[in-house]
Amino acid sequence: MKYKTIVGLEIHVELSTETKAFCSCKNSFGDEPNTNVCPVCLALPGGMPVLNRNVVNYTVMAGTAFNCKINNKSKFDRKNYFYPDLTKGFQITQNDNAICTDGYLEIEGDEGNKKIGLFQIQMEEDTAKSLHTEENETLMDYNRCGVPLIEIVTKPDISSGKEARVFLEKLKSTLRFLDISDCKMEEGSLRCDVNVNIKDMETGEKTAITEVKNLNSFRGVEKAIDFEVERHIKLLENHEEEIRTTRRWDDAKNETILMRVKYTASDYRFAPEGDLPIVHITDEEIKEIVDKMPELPDQMIERFVKDYGITREDAGVLASSRELAKFFEDLAKNFKDYTLLSNWIQTEILRRVEISDEEEFKLPFENKEFIELLNSIKSEKISNNAGKKVLRQMFETGEGAKEIIDKLGLVQMTDTFAIEKIVDEVLDENEQSIIDFKEGKDRALGFLVGQVMKKSRGKANPKIANEMLVKKLKER
């Protein structure tokens, strides 16, 4: 490998608290602009911040889930910069003494399992939302100003765009399981900035770090990193130098575009936040928070493999969403062939419906009807293909499985005497296929099974038909 890709991520996650981080204003997306505001989040004279305790609790949960050290003491800082989205002229954040430090998240990397290190998870406040009009005006909605955020800062351990996407998918799934954020990128409750550069492994030369913003999807993150890697390789190969810059991702053009020279920490003139006290949290308080945490995806995967005997890959799919996992376990209480259940959920249910953690997942028919269908397949009352036909009609009409099976006449023929009669007829009518089979042409058997199914109008049990054909072909 001539070039090594070096990627770090900065992920901002809005927390789903009822009120903002430092005032009692409602934390609610989509409300009428500038209705959830007060002297504190508008920085009017006399407005003083008071920390929302749930912000601390939620951050401790995230830190625990991502294997961080939870610090008993942490402090807030002021990040100074002038922009209309911050009326104070500074953002309340945590710079050098965050509540959660030194964590990691393990993912399936490009070369196997890999731990992506985390520098820290810090508490901070969000900024107002800028709205640009066709008249070239910029309007500000301060409803978002002061909404609680956690910023998750990774170490530069990510080696490709794909690894970054996998990391973000797992991080989002974990946060959703914790129920501390809805992680909707389209609403801005999960945002990601990328820092990327490359190193020539032969000379040790590195390119300057580029920060990429305006990434509104995980696929966009992956593509932006891949684009920047190629751009940085060209910089090295052409012996061009570039200072640290901030660029934005243009999804339509599939390229990054220069925004500005990148700020450094000194540009923000970080200073301690004097209006907020040191955050103290005891080991007992941390334990109380951790004890109330729900089962996390990795824990659920281990349990699914152990309790249900399904593959780790299948368990990973089923544990990718709280609602999907709940759906599987509800069905597993009454249907014990867990592999068949898992396969049908993944191949037939998930391609028809999108399961979201925002609302309880329900089929357009009762769960017991789906179990009735699976029992019919398992007992070989109907074939697998017939089962797919039945499920399709169940989704279209909401009718029960048995009702559709009976109405369409899909019950398999299992009478061996009846199937034997059809097999004999097929063999008598296809002498050439018998010759082909004896000459070792495997396709001949498939053709003969197809003829049996055709004569039986799809009702013959294909397993019985196949076994009977092989037996009779050997006898001829």
Model-inferred region functions:
Residues 1-295, 306, 312, 333-337, ...:
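Basic, nucleic-acid-interacting segments
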Residues 188-200, 268, 306-329, 338-356, ...:
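Core structural elements
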Residues 334-335, 341, 349-364, 372-377, ...:
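M16/insulysin-pitrilysin zinc metalloprotease superfamily fold
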